[in-house]
Amino acid sequence: MSVVGFDVGNLSSYIAVARGGGIETMANEYSDRLTPSVVSFGEKSRTQGHAARSQAITNYKNTLSQFKRFIARRFSDPSVQKDAKVVPYKITQLPNGNVGMQVQYLGETETFTPEQIYAMILTKLKSTAEINLCRKVVDCVISVPQYYTDLERRGVIHAAEIAGLNCLRVISDTTAVALAYGIYKQDLPTPEEKPRNVVFVDCGHSSLQVSVCAFNKGKLKVLANASDKNLGGRDFDWLLAEHFAVDFQTRYKMDVKSNQRAWLRLMAECDKTKKLMSANATLISMNIECIMNDRDVSGKISRADFEALAAELLKRVEVPLKSVLEQTKLKPEDIHSIEIVGGSSRIPSIKETIKKVFKKECSTTLNQDEAVARGCALQCAILSPTFKVRDFTVTDLTPYPIELEWKGTEGEDGSMEVSSKNHQAPFSKMLTFYRKAPFELVARYADPNLPIPERRIGRFKINGVFPTTEGESSKIKVKVRVDGHGIFNVASASLIEKLPVQAEDAMEDGSPEENGPSKEEGSGASQAENDAPMDQSPVQGGAGEGEASADKEEQADNGSKETSKDSKDQTSESSKSDKESKDQNSEGSKSDNSSTETDAKAAKKTKKTIKTHELSITATTDELSITEVNNFFEKEGKLIAHDRLEKEKNDAKNAVEEYVYEMREKLCDKFEQYISEKERGSFSKLLEETENWLYEDGEDETKSVYQTKINSLKKIGDPVENRFKENLERPGAFEDFGKALVPYIKTLDLYSNGDEKYSHIEKEDMAKVEKCVKEKVAWRDSKVNAQNQKAPHQDPVVTAAQIRSEIQSMKFVCDPIINKPKPKPKEEPPKDNGPTPEEAAKDGGPAPPTTEGGEEKMDTSDQAPTGEASKEGETKPDETKPDVEMELD
């Protein structure tokens, strides 16, 4: 299972993967870890990344960038209208009121949604990751700006689905950076100690995001977020471009803003100038050739002048920095450090502004470009069951307050705040309503100053609601949740039904709750009809705590189910016992039958039970429907297939072109003597005709046509190339042949001279070796002589491969014979020294003679001796030998 994190930025994207015990940022086919977030469409194909960015000026109308700012946005949105004026492509309104992007593709006008374009970049990143990992990539984590709304986050998830990815988590940029920072820190305070407060500032291409996070060992908690979604590096580029546009108008009488291509070139040069000023305080020059009307322009600016121009922008930088301090009630001295990331954070004046607010130097311990992607990969590893990661809890927050609204049954509408700004996320809440019929909840952002015109999140209809048997309102429990993606949902709804009870139970059981609606519930019914929810159970804390608390809520409801079931079981057992008692009494006495039945009836009682009905929920949001997502997924698959075919066709065409140029050069150089004059002339003419065909009739042919063309050329060129290669390899092969003959010839000489080393080899076997060697020598000499008669441009008599094959066949015959091991000398059998003492004693014969050392044979059997043993080395003829001889050590 792959563990991949994608950071899709407004200008560029990065891929990080967890493997080898760490996090690695991946490079693309250009050996660059940065992939431009650009998609370009042409008459024949589409391109993404670096190839698309190269067409940003020449094909600007069909090259889409900065699409991230249009996801799930209305065309009428003021910020959309503002961005539409600065992008070079055409923005249109879709039938649903959202933004569409119009381009010319394959000769037709096509309109794509921002989600589709986002998916195209994800497709490119996915392909790069799969090439690096050599496996399929499905699960991933994707970063989004912290200010993204519910619909925008849903749009990113849909884009991942269109690209064939399973997005495990949508994580805020600054939260991902904080995770990448904190998980490797070994010096964080313990959970019991005061947390370490760190500020993260992400200044990217189009936005500024600030976050304050509290760190303890194994725990990260986001305290506050603030951002300016319209302040980034591109705003400084526009500032410089406006400055030079006025300068060129004054000095050259040239309006570069009237020409889109000239303006794009100026913007690109201003970006380079801005980066140079970040590293140099000297005067920076800018030169653009043929910017417009075949005229060159130049300009100069210093860092001081640039900072003076950007004074208003730098003031805006202070706003979110001060905002997070106000939200958290922290002082600058409470901040441990300030970590800056993002390409635009390299601007010196931005660093100075941050330093002025927090009264601390900025820290750059994180990789400013790759930190977000690395945090995403870490989050994916935490969520993946195949990776073991150090325990680290992440508690994020909701960027905007959320409220619920509903229509009252008696004309008065109701509302309540579900979560406040900076509420911990994910979280769940259980709400209680009293209704007789299905009803609808409307979720919206509560802040009227929200930077988006449409504050509604969605509508959620609770279906299947019915009144009680008494005609009163039923108790409805609704669970709302903001999940790990930061997306709001009505997770579940259930109706609590109280089943009716018998009159006897009402008399025996005095509990008002069991006998019917209590006073509180009775008043609650009317109160509910006036739209006051009767119960809400807020859940705070991290992901684990929120889930646990939500489960407790649900378990409380399920507990009532189990209690009811237990009481039913008890009632059933009681009834069964009474019945058995009744049967026994009826067997004993018929007269007691009526009395027993009366007792059983009195004992039989049914406690009031509670039954829970799960209710269906119909959610209506402005996100893409399932059908639309499936259609876009199929269309993306067709685009990928078309791109693959186009690439294969271009590769085949390039192969033909490359072969033509290569062979034309070699025919006059390396291959000159390996082809006849006549053949060289005809082949050169064919190569020239093929080149002309490529740029005329063959400019746009199918892959098979190009393959046929190159195969026809190789029929002529390959023999020439083979003759060249054989001429290089053949002398070495003959030399190896001669070296292989030497040991066999030497062995034959030694054998003929009677060398002891080979005396064990039979004459017939050595004759085989001699015959084989003579045949191979004759074959070599004949081939060498025949090859010497051939001209270089003629096909060779023998190839290097054939020579090596002959060497192997010779070794196959000769090696087993000459390497035959000499047999070992035969071992002599042991001499017979007569019977052992034990055998001699059995047979009653004389004892055997002594050994060479003068010692007699010993026997260590357990039989008791019958006499003294003779001394070692002495033999007395007249002395009788004992039955057993023993020698003690």
UniProtKB/Swiss-Prot annotation:
Segments of skewed composition (Polar residues): 586-597
Record carries keyword ATP-binding: yes
One family name in Pfam for this protein: HSP70
GO cellular component: cytosol; nucleus
Stretch list, region Disordered: 504-622, 812-889
Keywords from the UniProt entry: ATP-binding, Nucleotide-binding
Stretches that traverse the bilayer: none
PROSITE patterns assigned: HSP70_3
GO molecular function, one term: ATP-dependent protein folding chaperone
Keyword Protein biosynthesis: no
Skewed-composition ranges (Basic and acidic residues): 549-585, 869-889
Family designation: Belongs to the heat shock protein 70 family.
Function, as annotated: Cell surface recognition protein that binds acrosome-reacted sperm and thereby mediates binding and subsequent fusion of the sperm and egg.
Protein name, UniProt field: 97 kDa heat shock protein
Species this chain originates from: Strongylocentrotus purpuratus (Purple sea urchin)
